[in-house]
């Protein structure tokens, strides 16, 4: 969904997105998007406790599929931000009546710009390449946390780089 408050008010975004949702079958939304674009409350806005509020995210994902029956799956990144540079990140994916969760990664970020876009692109990559649901969410969050460790807007990593993160037992990541 990618809500941008400088472009539209929440009220304007909700009018536009609610109309647009009839054409959506896969919904990628971040923590702000649920409420800002659809009026669905998922968490209290405290980025230091996003992962801790996973049950409200799950309820929000279910609510999207109830309000918009054409939406077959919903995915999001959840974060517990300890500082601007330090945080825990995970992905969650709802499809076919089941929730899939990635491991939680502790990340020291160089720059957060583009991490959500990286997640979305990697998620679509997993869908296109026929990954199973767990692999999709694991792959997407791995690409996203790799982007956090790269400065500027270019996430130049290979699929092999991502698989190394996915297969690593170490979830404390830094570069």
Residue ranges and their predicted role:
Residues 1-3, 26-36, 63-65, 106-115, ...:
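Low-complexity, flexible helical/coil segments
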Residues 2-97:
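Conserved phosphate/ATP/ADP-binding segment of small-molecule kinases
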Residues 39-47, 52, 89-94, 109-111, ...:
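Generic alpha-helical propensity signal that fires on short helical segments
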Residues 52-71, 90-94, 130-149, 169, ...:
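Short flexible/disordered coil segments
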Residues 99-168, 173:
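Conserved post-catalytic alpha-helical subdomain immediately downstream of the catalytic base
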